[in-house]
Amino acid sequence: DIIEYELHKKGFTYALLTDQPDEERFVPPMRGQFYDIVPFWCDDPTMRKVYSVTLPREKEMQFQFYQGECASSMRYENDRKVYTFAKNNMMPVRREPNMVDLYDAAPKLMMSSTPHWKDKSLWFHKTNEDYGSFAPLPEARQKVNELIRGKKTEMEKIAVLTHWVADNIRYAGITRGKGEGFTLHNTKMNYTDRCGVCKDIAGSLISFLRMAGFEAYPAMTMAGSRVESIPADHFNHCVAVVKLSNGTYMPLDPTWVPFCRELWSSAEQQQNYLPGVPEGSDLCITPVSAPENH
């Protein structure tokens, strides 16, 4: 038997909403931009898979097909551009024990109307600065001063702040009202609730570092999978970066280091991340953890 089905998505690729009267709900976080990550693998034998997207004629889009091949085309229809991608005779991917994520091994399509990662970095920075995610809080500043008292070096201060946040802001995946998605909740909410997801823990550390006199910003990363050069939103985790006295940015992940000595989990070596810094940044990669650390 053959089963043929179609899926329709409107607007923001991750909204996955249908029959909603409020058009605002289809707007992506980065307004005016479109991006999608399309798996072209299957769990059951598939004769043909087709992905098609229409854009305004004046909108540019870049795309790339990874780990395989597909038929692709772009056609003009009235005032629209229609991109179509198709693959025939698809068989289920053979999985292996402890293999890498399928996004790193199986066919996938990535597309984005955002020209460069730097554009995404600048947007991420502005979004959270405009929202006031890291505004100081008197009672939190008092805790920061208490923690760094007697600490002489920048690394001593960074370490004590990172570990306090890691050990005292509990991970709790709950909805906490306005400010979901790419907008980090503010210092008052995080310090009062003492819980949240990765972005709330990272946001707490950024606030603490700023109140201690450091320059710190949020960063997006993808734990467990590679991030490609196409600037789509292939992220599932939020971390922090702090600017050291030598001018370089150091990544910090308080979510993954509670009750351990590391500041950046060694499980996240050679992992791509995108800092939301005021000057904008290209995609970065975390360093290899030195052997003497283990």
Predicted segments, located by residue:
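Short, conserved phosphate-binding/catalytic loop or strand-edge motifs used
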Residues: 142, 177-186, 222-224
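Secretory-pathway-linked proteins and extracytosolic
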Residues: 6-21, 27-35, 40-179
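Noncatalytic alpha-helical scaffolds and linker/capping helices
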Residues: 188-191, 198
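Hydrophobic/aromatic-rich core segments of domains that either
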Residues: 199-289
